[in-house]
Amino acid sequence: MVLTQKNLVKRTTESTETEAVSDLLVSELLILGLSLPALLRPFSRQSRKISAIPLLPVLALSVGALTVLGQGLTLDLTLSLVSSSVVCLTELPRLVAFSQGIPNDLYSAGARIARVLLLVAGVFTLVIVCLCAPEPGYRPSRSVVRSSFSLRLGNTKVNAGLLLSLANPYETSHLDNPSAPHPSENPQSRAHPKQNPVGVNVVVLKNTPQSAHRAHPETLELMLAERGYTVFVPYQDAYSPSYSAASLAAPMRTSPGVVLLSSALRGVPFDVPTPYVSRRANTIDAATFEDAHVPALFPALFALCRHAPTFVYAESAHEVMLSRFLQQQPHACAGVFFVLPDSAARGPHHAPAVQGAPPPVDTAGVASAVRGASRTLPAVYRQYVHAAEAAWAELASTDILAAYLAGLPRDRHRTRLQARATQVDQWIRAQLHLSEPVLPHAQALSHHTVHAGGTYDRT
């Protein structure tokens, strides 16, 4: 394993911090702001003298393209890009005139009316962007180190994913003891070993695409690392032959907003894009369970973690793939925490039949096939949540407009995500028989876990 470390959080604070304004919101405001001078130019004599103003909408589109590549495509960002693209098209004749050195300050009555309408649309877009601004990102109260780890698969070394761990594993935190002095006041302080799961690994398998080109730890990973776990987040392009992080179509193909909007327009239930699992494996039952694809990275990753207790957090799209792997290697981990859509708890026969929709996954049949494979499978916990939340855990805090489209309420201050991380932590501690740390916000967050039921399985 090769580690390349860089600090993720450089300072320790008494309480959880949050970012004041997200980078995505700043980018969207910049896109809309760069389009504004071109719309106001017909109504200002001074602006008409500046012949280079038609270049600004092109710059706005460039900022939008970089934002999509760097942060992904949300539904409100899509609205900003559409608005900026229309402005750019209306300015195209003046842009050509500017490139040829011809005066471009003449506007017809129709052009002025068009710009008034675009101004109204721009204000409407601005209101949506501000109302649907992403929730501030989670900032740990401990110093967390972000690393990258590599695995050798055959003769090839692969940049496999993110690794998060505490800079000082025995640092006393208010998560452990609210009355403890701040680490800066008592640098020699130590947390009780039974309250700090140092040396316990958690592999996080999320539906949100993570790649070496666009990787950032999210709420659940940071909270688990903050509690003392060593967190592995594999890149999807490291175990997905069909997922290309460099592809310009990847953000569009995997965007929750685009998937939900497309499904709403077609009148069919949304389908989580899983390019690393075959189409047949995505709709299997117990009879076709043997056809599920297991990435070559998985055996290498769990072999890397074999010297310490290892647990897995897996969202819905990974259930088939991970269950197939555990059928082959039941001792690879100590337990799995699945997050599944609430329809799976009722079974496939309760799902509404929609013409053209893929057949539902027989999760009961898959689980039965896994349990029948071996009697030494790890402990399994299945939590059932809203279908959109099972598909994209961060949706209700990062793409608010898409969450509303899916019927999912906004996750203010990421409380539901924090509650889920607390549940994962408490479940792992129960498996390891560790004492519960004093979590000042655990009780306050427990009632926010809406639509969340769970079942234990131990075979």
From Swiss-Prot:
Keywords: Cell membrane, Membrane, Transmembrane, Transmembrane helix. Residues 174-196 are annotated as: Disordered. It is a multi-pass membrane protein. It comes from the Bacteria. GO terms for cellular component: plasma membrane. The chain crosses the membrane at residues 53-75, 111-133. It is found in: Cell membrane. This is Uncharacterized protein TP_0976. The lineage of its organism: Bacteria, Pseudomonadati, Spirochaetota, Spirochaetia, Spirochaetales.
